[in-house]
Amino acid sequence: MARKIEFDPEDEEFFGKVGSFGVPKFDNEMHGGVPRGFIMVAFTDTGSGSELFAKQFTSPAEESDNTLYISTNEGQQEIIRIFQKYDWPLDISVRTIGEEYNSTVLERELLASRYRLEGFRLDDIRRLAQTRFVEDNTQDYLTEVTNEIMALGPYFRAVVDSLDFFLQREDPSRVVAMVRMLQAHAQLNR
């Protein structure tokens, strides 16, 4: 049986029954916003502005410490630049999985390619002799993101931009399971 969360009546009054999309015209069309406890999955075309919409969805963060924006394709500096441009809050939590992946996985692959093409230099051999030759760096970004969002408390707001990163690297059934877990967490913590 799922745990039951008791909501403070003052919180219910403050947060209301719906959360803003961050786009007033869209909020009006959607009768005030998205109902609390709902999860949204948007399927968009490349170049349709989904990254901007994802950021804008975090902008009406009622509690910045309970708001999380996870980007899989943009860097920290680009995200900050956009938030500053539109005067959105900068005190929300941001995680840039794409940057993390590039620095941990792709840099090693690039180095391995260089070794294959150019061979080893004496400095490379000395450096490698001081480290383990086989790195055990299997990072499970999907589980990390799931746990990070599930740690958020009531009335949280989280955006994952985008699921493509996970679908390209994981079994799709694991990604769907993550979305279902997040849906249950959202319903519980509305």
Labelled PLM ranges:
Residues T72-Q84, Y101-N102:
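AAA+/P-loop NTPase substrate/partner-engagement loops
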Residues P24-Q76:
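Glycine-rich P-loop/Walker A and Walker A-like loops and their local beta1-loop-alpha1 context
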Residues R81-I82, D87-D91, E144-G153:
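Short amphipathic alpha-helices and their capping/turn segments at secondary-structure boundaries
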Residues N66, G153-R157, Q187-R190:
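Loop/turn-to-beta-strand initiation segments
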Residues M1-R36:
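A short, basic N-terminal segment
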Residues G75, L90-A112:
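P-loop NTPase motor core
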Residues S103-Q183:
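Phosphate-binding/switch loop-helix module in NTP-utilizing enzymes
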Residues F57-A61, A177-L188:
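Catalytic-core regions built around general acid/base machinery
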